[in-house]
Amino acid sequence: MAPPRGRAPRGRGKRSRGPVGRRDAFQASRVDDIESDDSSSGEDGPIDEHMEEGMAEEEAMDVGSSSDEEDEEKSGRPYNELLQLLNTSTDSKGPARKKRKVEHKNTETIEVVREDPVAEEDEEALGEDDLEQQEPSDEEDNGNQEDAGAQDSDDEDDNDPFDTHFTNPTEDELAKKIKAIGENKWKNAKKELPEGLRLVRAVPDTGDDASWLPPMKQISSVKLKRKLKEPASDKFPQISGQAQHIAPYIFGYQDVLYGARTPSNSAQMRDLLALHATNHVLKTRDRVLKNNTRLAKEQDSDLDVRDQGFTRPKVLYLLPTKQACVRAVESITRFFQPEQQENKKRLLDTFSAADDPSWESKPDDFRELFGGNDDDMFRLGLKFTRKTVKYFAQFYTSDIIMASPLGLRTIMDQADVKKRDHDFLSSIEVVIVDHADALLMQNWDHIDYIMKHLNLQPREAHGCDFSRVRTWYLDNNARYVRQMIMLTSFVTPEMNSVFSTHMHNTSGKVKATPIHAGAITELPLPVSVRQTFTRFDCLSPAKDPDARFKHFTTTILSSLVRDIASGRGKASAGGTLIFIPSYLDFVRVRNHFATSQQTTNVSFGAISEYTEQREASRARSYFMNGRQSVLLYTERLHHFRRYQLRGVKRIIMYGVPENPAFYSEIVGFLGLDPAALVEAAEGGVRALFSKWDALKLERIVGTQRVGNMMREKGGDTFTFM
């Protein structure tokens, strides 16, 4: 049985892009008598190795941002303890304030820091911090919460999606929608847009139709915090392109799966999401401060204020690299415009890096993903006050958590059961997953794990004031109110599973996918190339790997071996590239080449994401020079390295790639040697597919063609020129 896609691990380290090189190299050639190893154990080995490494390093780390401040805190404890004793003898009214600003005549502000040892120890213990118990900002300290809230508050609007979705949902209506979702009853609507986008909207079936929201062309129509309106208007004088059709559902707190992310529209989508996340955090804080003031004024009344969750973090970002995290932070600060950013230098020093100038020839999507610091092991907490944003805040004092799936899971799934913690995800109200296709190439199992632990009831109170917890939290219905937004360059079965399994928003959900012209129409070659797609029958996804392997060895490989044998000694005998999307399929085919009688006279090389750089270079050289007739090549290796393989005269695709850009790039290998271009065009491309490859195949051959190729009864071979 084939493993779920994206299960291969990623290693830790500063340069985590590309083959991690943790497996022993494998070289096999019947002609050259190159030794083979026994690295066909699948993917469990590297996963355990990297996870154990990450867990070991995290055992001493508090649940918080990537770089903890434990050493710094310890160094300050003796002084703080002495200070506490002095304060006890001189001021018995209470602990010293943590921060206070002193205004001088020259208008310079000097910040005097007096640490409260008790508060410090509470933070170390990951204790008791939620929105009500947040550390006071300068204006909120000393009873000035009313003034602080008034300066930056807005009148509540019954039409504000924040209030209608989170604050004032009707309990009866909410119960009806949750019941419909639990019974998987949805009303659906579909439409196509002139921008080449297909939309599918689903709402809980409570009698209402799934209507469409009008396009959002002006950001002024969004109910924004007063502080955000001006910078938002400056950044978005108008919303253009596909974003204007997606924005209404984002700001309307509906679940969104957007499958048309590109390097050209990613910045606009990132800014929209940053504005939405910041707006949500500020409104949450504003409601809490207002209610604090009301409760302080009316202490003798029976006010029932429900404005909080169990813990403070409200927004979760899942991102592929540290540089992607920095870009998201920059988008947030562009709108929030804080007067002070604590630990910003530390953030830039540890999360940001310059682009590699040698990558100018790489594709745009590669440079966007791997440019700068491409480390995929990180987590970062952001804490907001009225004028300040603090980076590297502990999770239980953070408003926004940004992390890679690997970085977050190492905290949640530590080897020591007692240290495992996921309570900080109990009150997440907005989840943003950007560049999900890149996360698929890391390890999708981490995504699944995190999704399953969202909005669970916390195991500890963490200082929660349960009298102010919203009712739908107490009823364990937070997952039905939570908003999830996922951006990806293409939609896969794994992402569709998230859409159907974890997107249960009572306000509805939307999936947007592009109408594909097909990668076969955009080949970077000056001549036409024969492209043949062969369908094989398979009854279920579980049987796909065996059926694919049987068809490959009995039909395609037998023909390839005959051609190589008949052309031995001729230039045409070599140059066959076999592209294999799955690593486990790669291992299976590689072992067959190494041990089967069928391939006794075939010299071959094999390179994957685990092959050492030196071994990969040697295999590429042998293949280019004709010393090896066949080269096995994986999709994840191409994703991380984007090699330009020379010497390719024919291409066999064991399966079509997930990323349609890879199809064009790999077929483009045929044109790297102009002298052999005509011969390569005759050799062409041959690809295998089954009905379970429908999503991938649609991106390769186009939306209009894929239906006939799946249903065709008259034959199973389709050729395009």
Swiss-Prot record:
Bias type Acidic residues, positions: 54-73, 118-144, 152-161
Any single Gene Ontology cellular-component annotation: nucleolus
GO biological process, one term: maturation of SSU-rRNA from tricistronic rRNA transcript (SSU-rRNA, 5.8S rRNA, LSU-rRNA)
Cellular localisation: Nucleus, Nucleolus
GO molecular function terms listed in the Swiss-Prot or TrEMBL record: rRNA binding; U3 snoRNA binding
Subunit structure and binding partners: Component of the ribosomal small subunit (SSU) processome composed of at least 40 protein subunits and snoRNA U3.
Known function: DEAD-box RNA helicase-like protein required for pre-18S rRNA processing, specifically at sites A0, A1, and A2.
PANTHER family on file: ORF PROTEIN-RELATED (PTHR12933), U3 SMALL NUCLEOLAR RNA-ASSOCIATED PROTEIN 25 HOMOLOG (PTHR12933:SF0)
Protein's name in the database: U3 small nucleolar RNA-associated protein 25
